[in-house]
Amino acid sequence: MKFFLKTALASTMAVALVSTPAQASEVCQDGEIVIKFSHVTNTDKHPKGIAATALAERVNSEMDGKVCMEVYPNSTLYDDGKVLEAMLLGDVQMAAPSLSKFEKYTKQYRLFDLPFMFKNMDAIDAFQSSETGQEMKSAMVKRGILGLEFWHNGLKQLSATEPLLTPSDAAGMKFRVMASDVLVAQFKALDAVPQKMAFSEVYQGLQSGTIQGQENTYSNIYGKKFFEVQDSVTESNHGILDYMVVTSTEFWDGLPNDIRNQLETILREVTVSRNAQSFAVNEANKEAISATGKTIHVLTDEQRAQWKAAMLPVWDEFKDDVGQENIDAAQAINAQY
């Protein structure tokens, strides 16, 4: 069936078609509803890229003749900073930016950037599946954006040019952060210097010394080869990096009911399947990083408590934006894990 995996040519802005055994090369047919899905990661090592590929394969197989989904990975169409505006203009129909990228449209998702909010991925999954978590998917409806599903990446780790074992080790170092005021405050709490930078620019920033460190999941550290230009990784599990699959309310509400219902069902099934495997993907990437000879420092309970104590004041700074009731709901669930 027709499935597009768009990749950018190295020297131009052209987009090339890539076909694999699981993806036939026919173009979208006349009369089909075309859904362009734009994301910023690779297609085979990253939980989001794997999930987007799986979603398109299901849609193009099961909705042949009705819907055609094209996937544009690796920022070949838009980066996360521009994709939401493109979606509102109708140039993209689906995307899955990290939860940090919705600052312009809602402050509620700052909850997911607050350091040490959740103990593990099970707690995160339970909260996102709860009534409070599900209600948060509609936080941007008045701005024309509808949240469809939460997609997991994983827990964030720290990497730097020097070992990071205590909070004082980060002092004075420049760390890349996403465009999130919470993450800026998080690194300022460590007396570090946060620098907002696009995901696509991080490798070069680390290589050139513009930044000395960054926070990310193992899948991002391995998939984007950040480990090549970092001396070590610290397994801190201090935060989460998750995504929300979104669409525009105009596009979604304009779909025939049967089409919308079938898309919802397929997306839900892909989400459950891929979220369950995100931990294994990150663990495999962790092992791959270790196999290159890079050192991975696993914090002791005492060391992790020091990092938590240093970062926890950030909660108070943003509790009004997030909503104390949302923090309380998250912590009530977190206490069960």
Where are these regions (language model features)?
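Short, low-complexity disordered leader/linker segments with a strong preference
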Residues: 1-34, 337
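Short, solvent-exposed secondary-structure boundary motifs
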Residues: 17, 135-140
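N-terminal secretory/targeting leader peptides
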Residues: 25-123, 131-132, 140-337
